[in-house]
From Swiss-Prot:
Source organism: Cereibacter sphaeroides (strain KD131 / KCTC 12085) (Rhodobacter sphaeroides)
Protein name (record): UPF0246 protein RSKD131_2757
Record-linked HAMAP family: UPF0246 (MF_00652)
One of the record's GO cellular component terms: cytosol
Alphabetical list of PANTHER family matching this protein: PEROXIDE STRESS RESISTANCE PROTEIN YAAA, PEROXIDE STRESS RESPONSE PROTEIN YAAA
Entry's Gene Ontology BP terms: response to hydroperoxide
Family stated for the protein in its record: Belongs to the UPF0246 family.
InterPro entries reported for this sequence: YaaA
Entry-linked Pfam families: H2O2_YaaD
Length: 257
């Protein structure tokens, strides 16, 4: 079983992660493609970044500086799960994983990225902001989806072949999972859905759903899951499997609001 997560927009101010002696940070397998994108992004102005990603002027200026220094600042790279600091990563809580779970996660948890394509948790990455939905023109087209094409799906196929995984658990957002070309992907996909019931209405509450996606990835890693049926035992955040709302491809987990 593989699981995929979205990255986080919010980055840790002081990223830190204690690793066991036999587990070292790794390098992104699609670093060459990240370098190519960084060269394109380096030519963008703060106004360009504000328009493309709808971000503030200070954040746009910060990322102009990051892309300008991208190829000279590789020593600033840190493991992805230490750098990402959003709600999903609060649910994942990689800093509190034991060594065995972290080793398993390094092999089986994948992080989708607009800049790096596909990451392992301990892949060293640099601070950046480049959302997958960005309409950044490259030699491959006018969006990052065009740039990545089937490369992310093929990278997932490679991970599956290396690990023997036979199913992919999609804990990513629609924006990011769209980058995994389903026609090229050789794995069946299971997409857990996290709903909150309040006043008789069931709906996705973004904050809790993002945390639950990270917690689901942690649950998979801690329990070394391979059988999709075992996902039903997930209980973090007050969620519980709801069989009447679920299908094999879309297990639904419900919590009271």
């Amino acid at each position: 079983m593989l699981a995929v997560l979205s990255p986080a927009k919010r980055l840790a101010a002081r990223p830190a992660l204690d690793l066991p002696a036999d587990l070292a940070p790794s390098e992104p397998r699609l670093q060459d493609q990240a370098d190519a994108l960084a060269r394109v992004a380096r030519d963008l102005t703060a106004a360009d970044l504000r328009r493309l990603m709808h971000i503030s002027e200070p954040l746009a200026r910060l990322n102009v500086a990051r892309f300008a220094e991208f190829h000279e600042a590789r020593n600033a790279a840190v493991p992805a799960v230490a750098l990402f600091d959003g709600d999903t990563y609060a649910g994942l809580e990689a800093r509190t994983m034991d060594a065995d779970a972290l080793r398993w996660a390094q092999e089986r948890i994948c992080i989708l990225s607009g800049l790096y394509g596909l990451l392992r948790p301990l892949d060293r990455i640099q601070p950046h902001r480049l959302e997958m939905g960005t309409r950044l023109a490259t030699e491959r087209g006018v969006t990052l989806y065009d740039f990545w094409g089937d490369r992310i799906a093929e990278a997932l196929n490679t991970r599956a072949a290396e690990t023997g995984a036979r199913v992919l658990v999609n804990c990513a957002s629609v924006e990011y999972f769209t980058a995994a070309d389903r026609a090229a992907l050789k794995l069946p996909v299971i997409t857990p859905t996290f709903l909150e019931e309040r006043n008789g209405e069931r709906k996705i509450v973004s904050f809790w759903a993002k945390r639950a996606r990270g917690a689901m990835a942690r649950f998979i890693a801690e329990n070394r899951l391979n059988d999709p049926a075992d996902l039903r035992a997930f209980r973090a955040g007050g969620y519980a499997y709801e069989p009447d709302l679920s299908t094999d491809e879309r297990p639904v987990f419900l919590r009271a609001g």
